[in-house]
Curated annotation (Swiss-Prot):
The keyword Transmembrane helix does not apply. Belongs to the terpene synthase family. InterPro entries: Isoprenoid_synthase_dom_sf, Terpene_synth_N, Terpene_synth_N_sf, Terpene_synthase-like, Terpenoid_cyclase/PrenylTrfase. It catalyses: (2E,6E,10E)-geranylgeranyl diphosphate + H2O = 8-hydroxycopalyl diphosphate. GO terms for biological process: diterpenoid biosynthetic process; gibberellin biosynthetic process. It comes from Salvia sclarea (Clary sage). GO terms for molecular function: copal-8-ol diphosphate synthase activity; magnesium ion binding; terpene synthase activity. It is an enzyme of class 4 (lyase). It holds the Pfam family Terpene_synth. Its main location: plastid. Substrate binds at R240, R459. This is Copal-8-ol diphosphate hydratase TPSSA3, chloroplastic. The Asp-Xaa-Asp-Asp (DXDD) motif is important for the catalytic activity, presumably through binding to Mg(2+). The lineage of its organism: Eukaryota, Viridiplantae, Streptophyta, Embryophyta, Tracheophyta.
């Protein structure tokens, strides 16, 4: 097997594979030739197909040394056309999925379907009110005699099977199906011993004894009524009921409303005052069915009819899920790096969330009189991120007297995923939002304690990668996270349709866990990466052509600069912006190095008419000065007169400060932001706008401090972020200026440029070289499969 140096791949490359060891071992020879830094190491394999695509692009295009930046972005090949077509098909599918979301898609719950099947005709006939539920049960028994999700969990299978057997027996239907179900329970009940308690379905210990009693009353034979484990479950139920104040269920909406069918004798009419606006009790079809059976309430009936409409005759475990499905869909699309394709749909979703938002937060479905920290945290974060006005003090509703945060009132054991979403929400903090500071400390410590024990406690979702996801999230705070780095990792963590959610039964959420999302994200990631690799070839040749090494610029530094640009603005069509970002960063360092180290003085007049007039105090530097001037000319080449005028102005301002010895990391950051904004079409008047000036000033201060932290190696991290009170306050102020809509003259995208640039400086200060090397290869060189 032949080793291939991708960074210097010839135009006619053959299908060969980079031979790489498991982690950090093979060296990139082009980078290794740098005299200033250690070689960059690889940690992944690059497929032959990926190499051939780069070669195909390169052969099809003009030679990279002669091609303009625009030429690079316009290259088309048969493979690229095919990928683009697949991407467009996937986008169309997802758009349709999102825009037809309605009350949210969710799989059928055999348990809830069985409870509804028990309802007798409300007009008094000896018939079921909902015969479709019985039909669904009859047609969905698994081969082993059980009912439940394909992901095996004995809690899910036992409860679903017991309920379905009782439902069929109550109408004396399908004795053969009943017999198979009874046999399954009898032969598998022992598996409850030692089963993972974290996978126990919600309310399991409350409803299993209830259905065992119903089975006894119906005369169902051979069920393991006297099995020690069944008796143990019954004892647990009695103990729980003793701990619940007798009248609590009638006083206020609590999680008890979720399992009313398992609570025994209740004053059912008293419960109606706690009914949600849609007629449900905590969005639970089975709990609502129990109330309907005892009250014949019309609103309960209407709710159940609605819940059955889109489930093929069965019922979901919760309905509606409009809030849950919308928030998590947006989150998944963003983290997978494909949200840009669905901006209209995302706004449509968030408008809906804003319209149903309550002062006490939200739950999985609208109008429930109940809220949880999971949905509320996700809502706070996404609404803030997209410029909606939302008060984070809503999270105080979940703060207990001892300072701890709880998923909801009455929660006995906290799970990892809600606290992780609280932590993520708390990182988008504006000045003065004390509740988010408290939430950050609590959630970080809560999750860190779980990680130290090497075991997460999770009751709501079964995900193979949740541990790794949370571990990474605590190591990589939002300020130090770049979009493409996040996508590269989340593609490893996201299971698509493989995620299983835990309610009264196991369930799936197509708008959240969807294989098409992942397929689209992989296609898009690899398409972007292929484009980035072509641009990286261009950057290497630019490095050699402009003799950047003579200015102290290492090849490693070049790669790092390009990586920061590509990991932030990654879209294939934004080649010019990426290259401008990377080259601006490099050129500013070249000029600073030339002026400060060699002692040379450069003189440029305001209008740049005298750009070619370079006066050198050292004759031997004339060659370098000429190279520097030519490189600067190349950077500005190709822009229209209006854009060129603005670029020269901001560069002139920056240059004067460098010559006066006032250059800094902050000034470099503002130069970069100004250059990117101008090339994006910024109106010259905006440069002097008060809001724009405030953004520039904050960015300067923040990035100057971050550069000092990086240069002086004084990094201290507390609760997942850099320990520097003033820096934290300034970052919060910048985030507020960027995210909060105030009707000002500065466009949101322009504001975001300052935050994006600042985050790259934060990234540089926060992550060590080894971590950055890994990120570089995940983003630029490791194809996703």
């Amino acid at each position: 097997m032949t080793s291939v140096n991708l960074s210097r791949a010839p135009a006619a490359i053959t299908r060969r594979r980079l031979q790489l060891q498991p982690e950090f071992h093979a060296e990139c020879s082009w980078l290794k030739s740098s005299s200033k830094h250690a070689p960059l190491t690889l940690s992944c394999q690059i497929r032959p197909k990926q190499l051939s695509q780069i070669a195909e692009l390169r052969v099809t295009s003009l030679d990279a040394s002669q091609a303009s930046e625009k030429d690079i972005s316009l290259v088309q090949t048969p493979h690229k056309v095919e990928v683009n077509e697949k991407i467009e098909e996937s986008i169309e599918y997802v758009q349709n999925l999102l825009m037809t979301s309605g009350d949210g898609r969710i799989s059928v719950s055999p348990y809830d379907t069985a409870v509804i099947a028990l309802i007798k005709d409300l007009k008094g006939r000896d018939a079921p009110q909902f015969p479709s539920c019985l039909e669904w049960i009859a047609h969905h028994q698994l081969a082993d005699g059980s009912w439940g999700d394909e992901f095996f969990c004995i809690y899910d299978r036992i409860l679903n099977t017991l309920a379905c057997v009782v439902a069929l027996k109550s109408w004396n239907l399908h004795s053969d199906i009943i017999e198979k179900g009874v046999t399954y329970i009898k032969e598998n009940v022992h598996k409850l011993k030692g089963a993972n308690v974290e996978h126990r379905t919600a309310g399991f210990e409350l409803v299993v004894p209830t259905f065992m009693q119903m089975a006894t009353d119906l005369g169902i034979q051979d069920l393991p009524y006297d099995h020690p484990l069944i008796k143990e479950i019954a004892d647990t139920k009695q103990q729980r009921l003793k701990e619940i104040p007798k009248d609590l269920v009638y006083q206020m909406p609590t999680n008890l409303l979720y399992s009313l069918e398992g609570l025994g004798d209740l004053e059912w009419e008293r419960l109606l005052k706690l009914q949600s606006g849609n007629g449900s009790f905590l969005t639970s079809p089975s709990s609502t069915a129990a109330v309907l059976m005892h009250t014949k309430d019309e609103k309960c009936l209407k709710y159940i009819e609605n819940a059955l409409k889109n489930c093929d005759g069965g019922a979901p475990h919760t309905y509606p899920v409009d809030i849950f499905s919308r928030l998590w869909a947006i989150d998944r699309l963003q983290r997978l790096g494909i949200s840009r394709f669905f901006q209209h749909e995302i706004k449509y979703f968030l408008d809906h969330i804003e319209s149903v938002w309550e002062e006490t937060g939200v739950f999985s479905g609208r109008y429930t009189k109940f809220s949880d920290i999971d949905d509320t945290s996700m809502g706070v974060r996404l609404l803030k991120m997209h410029g909606y006005d939302v008060d984070p003090n809503v999270l105080k509703h979940f703060k207990q007297q001892d300072g701890k945060f709880s998923c909801y009132i009455g929660q006995s054991v906290e799970s990892a995923s809600p606290m992780y979403n609280l932590y993520r929400a708390a990182q988008l903090r504006f000045p003065g939002e004390e509740v988010l500071e408290e939430a950050t400390k609590f959630a970080f410590n809560f999750l860190q304690e779980m990680l130290v024990k090497d075991r997460l406690q999770e009751r709501w979702v079964i995900s193979d990668h949740l541990f790794d996801e949370i571990k990474l999230g605590l190591k990589m705070p939002w300020y130090a996270t770049l979009p493409r780095v996040e996508a590269a990792y989340y593609l490893d963590h996201y299971a698509g349709s493989g995620d299983v959610w835990i309610g009264k039964s196991f369930y799936r959420m197509p708008e959240i866990s969807n294989d098409t999302y992942k397929e689209l994200a992989i296609l898009d990631f690899n398409r972007c990466q292929t484009q980035h690799q072509l641009e990286w070839i261009h950057m290497q040749e630019w490095y050699d052509r402009c003799s950047l090494s003579e200015f102290g610029i290492s090849k490693r530094e070049l790669l790092r600069s390009y990586f920061l640009a590509a990991a932030t603005i990654f879209e294939p069509e934004r080649t010019q912006e990426r290259l401008l970002w990377a080259k601006t960063r490099i050129l500013s360092k070249m000029i600073t190095s030339f002026v400060n180290i060699s002692g040379t003085t450069l003189s440029l007049d305001y209008n740049f008419n005298g750009l070619d007039e370079i006066i050198s105090s050292a004759n031997e530097d004339q060659g370098l000065a000429g190279t520097l001037l030519a490189t600067f000319h190349q950077l500005l080449d190709g822009f229209d007169i209006y854009t060129l005028h603005q670029l020269k102005h901001v560069w002139s301002q920056w240059f004067m400060k460098v010559q006066q010895g006032e250059g800094s990391g902050g000034e470099d950051a503002v130069l970069l932001a100004n250059t990117l904004n101008i090339c994006a079409g910024l109106n010259e008047d905006v440069l002097s706008n008060n809001e724009y000036t405030a953004l520039s000033t904050l960015t300067n201060k923040i990035c100057n401090r971050l550069a000092q932290i990086q240069d002086n190696k004084i990094l201290q991290v507390v609760d997942g972020s850099i320990k520097d009170k003033e820096l934290e306050q300034d970052m919060q102020a910048l985030v507020k200026l960027v995210l909060q809509e105030n009707g000002g003259a500065v466009d949101r995208n322009i504001r975001h440029t300052f935050l994006s640039v600042s985050k790259t400086f934060y990234y540089d200060a926060y992550h060590d070289d080894e971590t950055t090397d890994l990120h570089i290869f995940k983003v630029l060189f490791r194809p996703v499969v």
